Curated annotation (Swiss-Prot):
The protein's assembly and partners: Part of the 30S ribosomal subunit.
Function text: One of the primary rRNA binding proteins, it binds specifically to the 5'-end of 16S ribosomal RNA.
Any Gene Ontology CC annotation: cytosolic small ribosomal subunit
Domain of life: Bacteria
Organism: Borrelia hermsii (strain HS1 / DAH)
GO biological process, one term: translation
Protein name as annotated: Small ribosomal subunit protein uS17
CDD domains per the UniProt record, alphabetical: Ribosomal_uS17 (cd00364)
Keyword vocabulary terms for this entry: Ribonucleoprotein, Ribosomal protein, RNA-binding, rRNA-binding
Amino acid sequence: MARENKKDLIGKVVSDKMSKTIVVEIVQRKMHPIYHKYLKVSRRVKAHDEREESRLGDKVRIIESRPISKEKRWMLVEILERSK
């Protein structure tokens, strides 16, 4: 059965040094359950960039995919904003 609704995330490219792979940092705001203070929670995921078109600092959108390697489970969909 194919799954239609794939997760998508928006983040910033923090590394593009690997071949056909980028590291994207995802920053989310979560509320602390007791203190009700908003915290920035970040995580880094590796994403597949087939055409090697994204650069360091770009804002990108990635979607989940089948496992491509040991750590890559995301693919680049589009570049939302180029770095300056």
